[in-house]
Amino acid sequence: MEREESCETHPLLKGGRRKEKGYSHGLSSSQMHVIAAICEALFPSQPLDSQNNQSSVDKALSAFYTASGSQAPLPDEAAELLFKFNRSFPEALSLVSWVLLILSFRLGTLLLCGTLCLDWRWPFIHKFSEIPLEKREEILKRWSREKCWIPLRLVFVLTKLVCFYNLFSRADVNGHNPIWKAIGYQVDTREKLTQKKRPLQEGLIETMYETDSTLIQSLTEKGLEVTEDLEQNMYKIKCDAVIVGSGCGGGVAAAVLANSGHKVIILEKGEYFVSHDYSSLEGPSMNELYESGGILPSLDGKMMILAGSTLGGXSAINWSACIRTPDSVLREWSEKHKIPLFASPDYQSAMDTVCRRIGVTENCNKESFQNQILRQGCAKIGFKVEPVAINSSADHYCGSCCYGCRTGDKKGTESTWLVDAVGNGAVILTGCKAEKLNFTLKDGDNGTKRKTCSGVIASATWRSKVTKKLQIESKVTISACGSLSTPPLMISSGLKNPNIGKNLHLHPCQFAWGYFPEDMTNFSGNNYEGGIITSIHKVFEEDSTSTPRIIIEAPALGPGSFSALVPWVSGLDVKERMVKYARTANLFALVRDHGSGEVKAEGRISYKLDKIDRESLQTGLRKALRILVAAGAVEVGTYRSDGQRIKCRGIKESDLEEFLDSVRVVGGPSSRNEVWTVFTSAHQMTSCRMSATEEEGAVDENGESWEAKGLYVCDGSVLPSAVGVNPMITIQSTAYCIASNIAESLKKQN
């Protein structure tokens, strides 16, 4: 079955609730009273003075200050977001649920809130929901600073996150949120690229439109050999190569293998969207296009991680930056890690091929508000700033590509490599998740037995009516589901190499902000408009002029994501910050991390920030603040929990230096410091790294598993170490080389 063609926004990317059957968060009414009281304290009604005139903007502003976080349905929607943690971080949901329950009782409130819940009148102790608003605000301030009982701070962090993210990213059925006008935000409504036929339709099977009976017909119509196994309730499908994942690695591998004449099946757990499907709405788009709906923390809560989860993977939602692998990194990989591929002409040729296929251009005809500020700030203090190549045209002025490119200008794998693959007979199954790799034992060298991968077991995701499992039997199996998902798939399938899931690098980031009022600065536009990354400032290692230790760039932060990061020091303060949203420029410092983490099970990510990385981030954060001040910001600050900031108009150099000296990179919410911060990551690499020996990594220099013949890894997890810049070109080029070798080996087998 196929989805009916329409030029309307895809139903999954529209605003409004799609289900009218109530909420599934499972919280009791007493717990909901508590969460509503917390939301009200976080975002209280603060009516403006009546002397404001009654222009439409002032009316919107007045309504914004009057609005409260306790207004229905906001608390229920925040609770629904909390429920997202249940799959990957159930301890967090349990913790919040228990605290909400305790706070619904008087003695429990006394235990967690202390004397602020006491009253001279009967019954002398208030439940949390009965405590006056001002005192509830004070309780939340104490929780934010709590150093002894860290679970209370984590409850504060999680409830703040879901309250504000929901409040500012939600949209109704018409794609509208009444508070956006007050903060100067407008959803991208430019004309979309409309295509009569979706580019991948010929090779596409969308399981959410299939049933058991229609699926076998769809598979057969695509030229696949399918048999039904009634005893095991599964369909068995044969092909030359099965690829799990469709992003920067999987998309390239699919094209190379299909172009070589092999029958390829691509499995993608996400759904397929094209340009006219996209809504540019932050909430629905993040929910459908990102892993865990864009809310994916590390186990200790210090790292918030963004990863793509749609057809095209991260290439469909990334920020367009196309940076070739630095020469110094290639030397390190070829010499230190002893992988000759990265010193070869083949790799250089692969980078050229990749850049051609995804339409990389070095030019940008009009820079965005944030990139103008980065460039001008650097120029004023003598920092070198370089242009960043992008995989779109020079006229591409789109700030919402992180929600899918509605103009179709940006070239992700879903509009390039996968189109090539489908044109050569590849079949794509969306809404289809790999559960387990299949292995058989075959004779190896020296009379020993070696595992050989014979394919994969997969199942349709929850939207589908397909109940049968899919057993895909293949000559080669490629895991390309990314650094967060490839290791759990391999480990849950029985592979034992201890390097699988370890050495995870995340390119940790810290953000700085500067406020540029429209009437006081000469920068045009708003922070959500224009190309996302078109300029870069690099900070090099002391002994090198080619290895960036830190890079400073501009991010995409929709109002929901911005509000979730903003420090909360009071309800009034957060409202005053949010009305400045549109003209608040953000810059981030990213480090090529020495520290690493691990991911052994889905969504269970741990990460340790190395001391060197902390110092580098501190250097980068101070430089970012200096750039913002030089560009003319009237106020700058960090996202540290205490709301660290300084007014800049007419500031003395000595006062600025004193402020910058106070900027430290502190620990996450689980640290026992009074102030804390949250780190972010949009690049995940090296969790199944390529190595010269089995003791050093998970796969060999051809991307093949050391443990299982015929099993390859073809995504960012194979990189030997962190790249230090956006890894898209590196991942695609590495995938191109690995897939070319696989195609050659299949040719020899045949």
Curated annotation (Swiss-Prot):
Residues 1-24 are annotated as: Disordered. It is an enzyme of class 1 (oxidoreductase). SUPFAM superfamilies: FAD/NAD(P)-binding domain. Its EC number is 1.1.3.20. Keywords: FAD, Flavoprotein, Membrane, Oxidoreductase, Transmembrane, Transmembrane helix. The keyword Transmembrane helix applies. Pfam families: FAD_binding_2, GMC_oxred_C, GMC_oxred_N. It is found in: Membrane. Long-chain fatty alcohol oxidase involved in the omega-oxidation pathway of lipid degradation. Belongs to the GMC oxidoreductase family. This is Long-chain-alcohol oxidase FAO2. The lineage of its organism: Eukaryota, Viridiplantae, Streptophyta, Embryophyta, Tracheophyta. The gene is FAO2.
